[in-house]
Amino acid sequence: MALNLQGKQAIVAEVNEAANGALSAVVADSRGVTVGAITALRKEARANGVWMKVVRNTLAKRALEGTQFECLSDSFVGPSLIAFSSEHPGAAARIFSAFAKKNEKFELKTAAFEGNVVDAAMLATLPTYDEAVARLMSAMKEASAGKLCKTIEAVRVQKEEQAA
């Protein structure tokens, strides 16, 4: 589909806006995946606060200039599907990883978090906020009150030593 200049500018602005509000991004190759499967992926992504779009490589590179995801520019080779997570850093990677397990033709290219290229598998295993709080609470429950007090005291002493 041929796009006029205004259409291209609108796509660049849309992708740039999504990138500026995102915590992480994932780029994938969806060649060979059926339209029905991609539609289901889009539906799941929307439900999890993930923005995704198939974008031309040159437009994607231009849209990501000056954002924390500029490091992804080298991954835009061939058909590219880009997704931005705005609610949880691991959401897009988790959704794409699960989808790739079901669809062998779907291939994760790369992921970015806080301006750095990271392994998508690592990003997908990040705990959600609720999981992290649950882990912290269980760790605090397991530790006896004395151990917790000693740990807090040790941290206080260490910070005082660093300040001096």
From Swiss-Prot:
One of its GO terms (molecular function) is large ribosomal subunit rRNA binding. SUPFAM superfamilies: Ribosomal protein L10-like. The keyword Iron does not apply. PROSITE patterns: RIBOSOMAL_L10 (PS01109). Keywords: Ribonucleoprotein, Ribosomal protein, RNA-binding, rRNA-binding. The keyword Secreted does not apply. GO terms for biological process: translation. Forms part of the ribosomal stalk, playing a central role in the interaction of the ribosome with GTP-bound translation factors. Part of the ribosomal stalk of the 50S ribosomal subunit. The N-terminus interacts with L11 and the large rRNA to form the base of the stalk. The C-terminus forms an elongated spine to which L12 dimers bind in a sequential fashion forming a multimeric L10(L12)X complex. This is Large ribosomal subunit protein uL10. It comes from Pseudoalteromonas translucida (strain TAC 125).
